[in-house]
Amino acid sequence: MVNPKSELFEQHPDWAIHDENREIYYYRNQLVLDLSNPKVQDYVYSVIENLMKENPDIAFFKWDCNSPITNIYSPYLKNKQGNMYIDHIRGIYNVMKRVNKNYPDVPMMLCSGGGARCDYEALKYFTEFWCSDNTDPIERIYIQWGFSQFFPAKAMCAHVTSWNKNTSVKFRTDVASMCKLGFDIGLKDMSAEELEYCQTAVSNWKRLNPAIMDGDQYRLVSPYESNHMA
């Protein structure tokens, strides 16, 4: 993403996906960088590389595709506009190949507010997908059931959040523990008992990690056919 009032856009307006001859639509006051352009790929990689050089202890990256592509025109592709979507995604993968090669031990989540950017090629470069911004544990049961039809549990990032406080922290944690467990919740708002339970749950998840992440999966009870699932 690039802000039209940024130094980057002022210096390289042709690096953004847009057609100067048409009214430009801004999503979150931004445009999408044209990753079909090798120069843009080099720039994006350099940003990550500089971050790692300046902060070698970075332990995690979240790559968030926070905008649909709206202004459908690539200044770089010129008369090959039919290639734009494909070449743009290939450009993302070219960047990720370099990141993965040079920083293989840094896990990376691919996010799009949901599963819109999840595919098998991306599994080569990202350690996990953010399945949905909907973290209601009841609805996540259906999301994770469906997502697991196509991707393994280790590819699904599942976080305990404050969404749907009508459910217990235990229930929220149990649902998230089916996948790659994480927490996006204010610890100061949790009781001592809840904190103690979560600490125990994390220890158990780590102990059971080989089975959860790499074990064989058997579908026993569908949430679509019952009020529980297994």
Language-model features: locations:
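Active-site neighborhood of glycoside hydrolase catalytic domains
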Residues: 7-170, 174, 180-196
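Short, solvent-exposed polar/charged micro-motifs at secondary-structure junctions
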Residues: 5, 119-120, 225-229
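Glycine/alanine-rich phosphate-binding loops at beta-alpha junctions
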Residues: 1
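Glycan-recognition and catalytic regions of carbohydrate-active enzymes
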Residues: 184-230
